[in-house]
């Protein structure tokens, strides 16, 4: 994947409150390492996958810490999304993803990246 393909574009961000609520009500859940992943397939999306990331305030009181965690999750997603996108383009489906950190400790980037890639592999087996 070239450098242009490794961007996390606006079209890939899950930002619609209606869609997020639908995802939490009707989505499927699985755990991957330090992440809880809520996902749902969709047929009428512009992008192959849309993703959102969350770090709970209950576990990480400081906003700077939560922002750092979300930044690491987005970076790991951006660098490894080709794993998921290759499969999705073959199957001609789109998917909504919501990643929530479940660890009580501050994860490093390698742990986050490992959990994201495990989540992609698990998701591929579930679709």
Question: How should these model regions be labeled?
Answer:
Residues 1-127:
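Positively charged, solvent-exposed patches that mediate nucleic-acid binding
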């Amino acid at each position: 994947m070239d450098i242009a393909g490794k961007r996390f574009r606006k079209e890939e961000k899950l930002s619609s409150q209606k869609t997020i609520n639908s995802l939490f009500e009707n989505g499927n859940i699985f755990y991957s390492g330090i992440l809880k992943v809520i996902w749902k397939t969709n047929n009428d999306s512009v992008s192959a996958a849309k993703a959102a990331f969350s770090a709970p305030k209950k576990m990480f009181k400081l906003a700077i810490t939560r922002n750092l965690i979300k930044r690491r999750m987005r970076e790991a997603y951006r660098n490894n999304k080709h794993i998921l996108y290759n499969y999705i383009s073959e199957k001609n489906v789109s998917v909504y993803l919501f990643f929530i950190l479940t660890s009580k400790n501050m994860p490093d980037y390698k742990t986050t990246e490992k959990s994201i890639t495990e989540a992609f592999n698990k998701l591929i087996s579930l679709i």
